[in-house]
Amino acid sequence: SGILIPMIVPVDTPLWMIAVATAFAVVFAKEVFGGTGYNVFNVALVTRAFLFFAYPAAMSGDQVFVRTADTFGIGGGQVVDGFSGATPLGQVAIAGKELIGSFQAVDVLGHPISTWDMFLGLIPGSIGETSVLAILIGAVILLFTKIASWKTMVSVFVGGAVMSLIFNMIGTTVAMCVSPLDHLFLGGFAFGAVFMATDPVTSARTETGKYIYGFLVGAMAIIIRALNPGY
């Protein structure tokens, strides 16, 4: 939890907010149930939920710090050291119902964000959520060491893809029109599927349960994105 929590919050989140949220989660989501191995809620997720509801302005994704210098020669175009801008999902929320069928997420300089940008992590967002490539490397390590179950991981992605396809067919809002691939690449979906849903304490333990649990996690994540204006 101590490693995951910094990975799922914006880089400019005040440290005192993280400290308060972490203390709340450890006490009320872990210790009250008996401590390590007995908690029924993921401590890192409870921390993130506490931050979202207690300090929504800092967690909404409307404005986050964005670095404009290149990283190992990738993603250049520096004009200033950094400035704030909306995350792609933040742009979806801001767009509302005005641009149905024509929405295109852009970076802080106004350039369209490509699928390749999402995969490499050249988009604004929390530290651990932007690079799908890095998340996949982490997934390989977890699977190789047998810490996590591939059944849970795959089921989360399948559940998310199926639900996003259903919303695509409905297509009454911008959030519903986001493609399944974009849904899986944007925000914390991939990070959650790999590092959160596979938590050995709070995730399903039966083989059949892993499929059902993962599918429901992925489907619920997309439902919240598409129907909750404050995601």
Show the residue positions of the predicted features.
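Cytoplasmic-side transmembrane-helix entry/capping segments in multi-pass membrane proteins
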Residues: 1, 17-23, 38-49, 150-158, ...
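Alpha-helical transmembrane segments in multi-pass membrane proteins
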Residues: 1-6, 17-21, 25, 29, ...
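Generic transmembrane alpha-helix motif of multi-pass integral membrane proteins
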Residues: 2-10, 136-142, 191-197
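Transmembrane alpha-helix boundary signature
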Residues: 8-19, 34-41, 56-67, 169-172
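Transmembrane helix interruption/hinge and helix-loop junction motifs
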Residues: 9-18, 129, 145-149, 227-231
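Structural signature of hydrophobic alpha-helical transmembrane segments
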Residues: 11-21, 118, 122-132, 176-189
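Long hydrophobic alpha-helical segments that form multi-pass transmembrane helix bundles
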Residues: 37-135
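Hydrophobic alpha-helical bundle architecture
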Residues: 141-151, 164-231
